[in-house]
C-alpha cells in the first residue's frame, strides 16, 4: 500500500458540505465513489485537511488516501477527473510518506471570504459572495481584526453545537481589503473551529456597520461564549484556500492543469 496526497478544488454550491452524509451529495462521497470505481469495487477512504460546510468552496483542499495500485502518480488527476463531476477537480497528486495526514500534517490553513458591497446584486456572483448593501467602515474592521492575532481561546467564535473541548487556536495573519466592489477577508492560522471563520466575518461586518465598536473584540474573546459574538456569515462567501504541510509537499506534476476546461 502507498499513500497518495491530492490537492482538490470544488464549487460547494450543490454540495451538503465535504463530509459524507446519508442521502446527501457531498464532496467526500463523490471522491470515494470514483475511487471505488477505479479500484474495481474496493472501498477507499478519503481524509481531508478540513470539512467544509454546505455551500463552502475550496481552491486547494488537501486530501489523502491509501491505494494498492501502482500506476504513476501523475496519472491520478487524469483518472479521477475523467469520472468526477464538473464541480470537483483534482489539481495535483503526489506520493506522500506513510505518516502524512491531510489534517494533522497541516501546519497552517488559510481561508478567504468575499463580500459584495455594491448597491446592486450580481446574479453571477450570488453563489460566491455575500451581498451586503449597507456602508462598511473598513478601517474600524481592520482595527478589530488585528486583535484576533495570536493565541486565544476562540470559544466565542465557535458554533455552540461544536463538541471539541480545546478551543485554543493561533491566528497568524488576518487581513481585509477592497478589490473593486468586493471586500476580501483573509485569515490564516494553525487550525479553525466549527464556523469560526464565518463567525469572525459576521462579527467584523457588524463592527463595520457600526453595530459594535472595534474595541469589543477583546471582550468577546474574554467572554468565551457564542452569544457574545456576531452572527454567522453565510457559507457561500467562504473559500478554503491553501494548507502548509509539515511533511509531504504536494508539487505540480509538470502536467497541464487538468481542470482548465471544466470551469
From Swiss-Prot:
Binding-site positions, substrate: 111
EC number in record: 5.4.99.12
CDD domains named among the record's database cross-references: PseudoU_synth_EcTruA
UniProt keywords, alphabetically: Isomerase, tRNA processing
InterPro entries in alphabetical order: PsdUridine_synth_cat_dom_sf, PsdUridine_synth_TruA, PsdUridine_synth_TruA_a/b_dom, PsdUridine_synth_TruA_C, TruA/RsuA/RluB/E/F_N
Record keyword Isomerase present: yes
Annotated active site: 53
Enzyme class: isomerase
Substrates-to-products reaction catalysed: uridine(38/39/40) in tRNA = pseudouridine(38/39/40) in tRNA
Tree of life domain: Bacteria
Biased composition (Polar residues): 241-263
Known partners and oligomeric status: Homodimer.
Job description of the protein: Formation of pseudouridine at positions 38, 39 and 40 in the anticodon stem and loop of transfer RNAs.
Family named by the database record: Belongs to the tRNA pseudouridine synthase TruA family.
Name of the molecule in the record: tRNA pseudouridine synthase A
Annotated organism of origin: Halalkalibacterium halodurans (strain ATCC BAA-125 / DSM 18197 / FERM 7344 / JCM 9153 / C-125)
Amino acid at each position: 500500500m502507498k499513500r497518495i496526497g491530492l490537492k482538490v478544488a470544488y464549487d460547494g454550491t450543490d454540495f451538503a458540505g465535504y463530509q459524507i452524509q446519508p442521502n446527501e451529495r457531498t464532496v467526500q462521497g463523490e471522491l470515494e465513489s470514483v475511487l471505488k470505481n477505479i479500484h474495481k469495487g474496493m472501498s477507499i477512504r478519503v481524509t481531508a485537511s478540513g470539512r467544509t460546510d454546505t455551500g463552502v468552496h475550496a481552491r486547494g483542499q488537501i486530501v489523502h488516501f491509501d491505494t494498492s495500485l501502482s500506476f504513476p502518480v501523475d496519472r491520478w488527476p487524469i483518472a479521477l477527473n475523467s469520472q468526477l463531476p464538473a464541480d470537483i477537480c483534482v489539481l495535483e497528486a503526489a506520493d506522500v510518506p506513510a505518516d502524512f495526514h491531510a489534517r494533522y500534517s497541516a501546519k497552517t490553513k488559510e481561508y478567504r471570504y468575499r463580500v459584495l458591497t455594491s448597491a446592486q446584486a450580481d446574479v453571477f456572483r450570488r453563489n460566491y459572495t455575500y451581498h451586503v448593501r449597507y456602508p462598511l467602515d473598513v478601517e474600524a474592521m481592520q482595527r478589530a481584526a488585528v486583535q484576533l492575532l495570536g493565541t486565544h481561546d476562540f470559544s466565542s467564535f465557535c458554533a455552540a453545537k461544536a463538541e471539541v473541548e480545546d478551543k485554543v487556536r493561533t491566528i497568524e495573519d488576518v487581513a481585509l481589503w477592497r478589490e473593486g466592489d468586493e471586500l476580501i477577508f483573509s485569515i490564516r492560522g494553525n487550525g479553525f473551529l466549527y464556523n469560526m471563520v464565518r463567525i469572525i466575518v459576521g462579527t467584523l461586518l457588524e463592527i463595520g456597520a457600526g453595530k459594535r465598536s472595534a474595541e469589543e473584540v477583546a471582550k468577546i474573546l474574554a467572554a468565551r461564549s457564542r452569544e457574545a459574538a456576531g452572527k454567522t456569515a453565510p457559507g457561500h462567501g467562504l473559500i478554503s484556500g491553501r494548507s502548509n504541510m509539515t511533511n509531504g509537499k504536494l508539487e505540480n506534476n509538470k502536467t497541464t492543469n487538468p481542470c482548465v476546461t471544466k470551469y
